[in-house]
Curated annotation (Swiss-Prot):
Gene giving rise to this polypeptide: WEE2
Residues in coiled coil: 495-521
Active site per the UniProt annotation: 341
Organism expressing this protein natively: Ailuropoda melanoleuca
One Gene Ontology cellular component: cytoplasm
Amino acid composition bias (Basic and acidic residues), ranges on this chain: 31-51
GO biological process: female meiotic nuclear division; female pronucleus assembly; mitotic cell cycle; negative regulation of oocyte maturation; positive regulation of phosphorylation; regulation of fertilization; regulation of meiosis I
Post-translational events: Phosphorylation leads to increase its activity.
Ranges of Acidic residues composition bias in the record: 19-29
Protein name, per record: Wee1-like protein kinase 2
Length: 565
């Protein structure tokens, strides 16, 4: 019986129909190799007959056996044939069984068991690293997720440039990963890839924070962009003003507009003449801002009540309002921002709550802490139109208080636009009629003419208001100048006069001390010259004897006086 017939019968038993031609050739090569190494050719026929009835080998029990066997088959056919297998001890010269196993592992036959096929794919590849902590730590996929999530962080446009660069600068601690090392040069573009993202404003499926944390008391205001509610926080029991945007976020531009006020509040921080900001979040596609509650309402409400009763704010109160709002504007302008919507409805009043403990007199005598003792505080609120002085993106406010240069899109003197609006606000608080929104009367005011005020104001105060609405913004006083104006702070003028007198007295004292030192130096120098002249005379030897003798005489009088007769 030849080799080909034996090989065909073995293939029929294994039902190996997909790789017949390949198995024939390989089987024949294996027999030729085996015959070359055999030392007893006489037994070949008997062994061939026994190979006809060789049963299939036992199934592989583990992935380890498959991988081990495959590694052996990959070395060389000779090594595979010469390796003794425990399942073939009775048939040491049977080549078909290991060859069939290699076919099961290497050929994707329709009759190949799926388990063996999948195991062969695994074993044919390189060693898979363990999914331990080290593998997870250095895989780039989670790091890509971190970079993606960091792109969802909003960049506050009002943050100072130096602080923003420091904030965006990487500290290099995460640069152990290869992908991040390659992406290192693009770190400077982080800011460009961090716009206001819509997902930053969206809440996940969770209970309403507004309903969970706050108890709504009443509605206290309605504006163009939102409604304000008086609420009590359930946790601390304090009262807050919660502002909810009227319109939902329909697009990215509306989101930026809604975030504008949050950005401004966050950068400004806390100031006694700016409404305090606590937190903000998005809920049901609406922006919600938690602010300080001002128990006195708005200045517009107070003006309306005065108009109904026929009263007006008197000049001392008007000066107080102007001074406090000027201090708030000074702080905003010094932070590199402008409000651009100063008007009575955006100025809020806080009445000081009476304390059970008496106020220590020393605490209110300091001029620098005068606002701590004020019974009424005036604060600037509604920062929805705030923009940067250096990079303005102007959103026009109320046209009744709008400066002409803003209408002409001249943004070179933006802080002076707030001064213009503040001057008209004080005029309205003084009793002026409702301001025009357009027309000849509107332009009449922009020419530097105050509206009619029913009460008599002092000349200096009236002129100050006129300067605040001067047609040329450069001629208007700054917020810092208003804060130190003697018209608004007479006591500050007296203090300055006293300070000047003190400085003059200090100068006089310093002059006298200098003259005294010069006189002392002249006297000492004269004494030194006198001593030098006496020691330099021609009869120096005689004078020396006399001086010595004189000294000796004096000493003898003290020493020998008692013993002399």
């Amino acid at each position: 019986m030849d080799d080909s017939s034996i090989n065909k019968e073995l293939k029929q038993k294994l039902n190996f129909s997909y790789c017949e031609e390949e198995s024939e050739s390989e089987g024949q090569e294996a027999w030729e190799t085996r015959d070359a190494h055999s030392q007893i050719p006489d037994r070949a026929e008997g062994q061939e007959s026994e190979a006809k009835f060789t049963p299939p080998g036992p199934p592989l029990s583990s992935v380890h056996e498959v991988g081990t066997f495959q590694e052996k088959t990959k070395k060389s056919p000779e090594q595979v044939l010469m390796t003794p297998v425990s399942g073939f001890r009775n048939y040491p010269e049977t080549p078909a069984q290991p060859d069939s196993r290699s076919k099961l592992l290497d050929c994707e036959s329709p009759f190949t068991p799926k388990g063996l096929l999948s195991q062969s794919v695994i074993s044919s590849t390189e060693k898979i690293p363990s999914r331990g902590s080290k593998h997870l730590r250095f895989t780039p996929v989670p790091f890509v997720d971190e970079m993606t999530s960091s792109a969802l962080v909003n960049i506050n446009p009002f943050t100072p440039e130096s602080y923003r660069k420091q904030f965006l600068k990487s500290n290099g601690k995460r640069k152990t990963r290869g992908d991040f090392e390659e992406a290192g040069p693009g770190e400077g573009n982080v800011e460009q890839g961090l716009p206001a993202k819509r997902c930053v404003l969206q809440e996940t499926n969770m209970a309403s924070r507004y309903e969970k944390e706050f108890l709504e008391v009443e509605k206290i205001g309605v504006g163009e962009f939102g409604t304000v509610y008086k609420c009590i926080k359930r946790l601390d029991g304090c009262v807050y003003a919660i502002k909810r945007s009227t319109k939902p976020f329909a697009g990215l531009s509306n989101e930026n507009l809604a975030l504008h006020e949050v950005y401004a509040h966050a950068v400004l921080g806390h100031h006694p003449h700016v409404v305090r900001y606590y937190s903000a979040w998005a809920e049901d596609d609406h922006m919600i801002i938690q602010n300080e509650y001002c128990n006195g309402g708005s200045l517009q409400t107070a003006i309306s009540e005065n108009t109904k009763s026929g009263n007006h704010f008197q000049e001392p109160k008007l000066k107080d309002i102007l001074l406090q709002i000027s201090l708030g504007l000074k702080y905003i302008h010094s932070s590199g921002m402008v409000h651009l919507d100063i008007k009575p409805s955006n100025i809020f009043i806080c009445h000081k709550m009476q304390s059970d403990s008496p106020v220590v007199p020393e605490e209110i005598e300091n001029e620098a802490d005068w606002f701590l003792s004020a019974n009424v505080m005036y604060k600037i609120g509604d920062l929805g139109h705030v923009t940067s002085i250096s990079k303005p993106k102007v959103e026009e406010g109320d046209s009744r208080f709008l400066a002409n240069e803003i209408l002409q899109e001249d943004y070179q003197h933006l802080p002076k636009a707030d001064i213009f609006a503040l001057g008209l606000t004080i005029a309205v608080a003084a009793g002026a009629e409702s301001l025009p929104t357009n027309g000849a009367a509107w332009h009449h005011i922009r020419e530097g003419k105050l509206p009619d005020i029913p009460q008599k104001l002092s000349e200096e105060f009236y002129n100050l208001l006129k300067n605040m609405i001067h047609p040329d913004p450069r001629e208007r006083p700054s917020a810092a100048a208003l804060a130190r104006s003697r018209v608004l702070r007479p006591s500050l003028g007296k203090a300055e006069e006293l300070q000047q007198q003190l400085n003059l007295e200090k100068f006089k004292t310093a002059t006298l001390e200098r003259e005294l030192r010069e006189a002392q130096q002249a006297w000492f120098s004269q004494e030194e010259r006198g001593d030098a002249g006496v020691s330099g005379t021609p009869t120096g030897s005689r004078s020396t004897k006399r001086l010595v003798g004189g000294k000796s005489a004096k000493s003898s009088s003290f020493t020998w006086g008692k013993s002399s007769p």
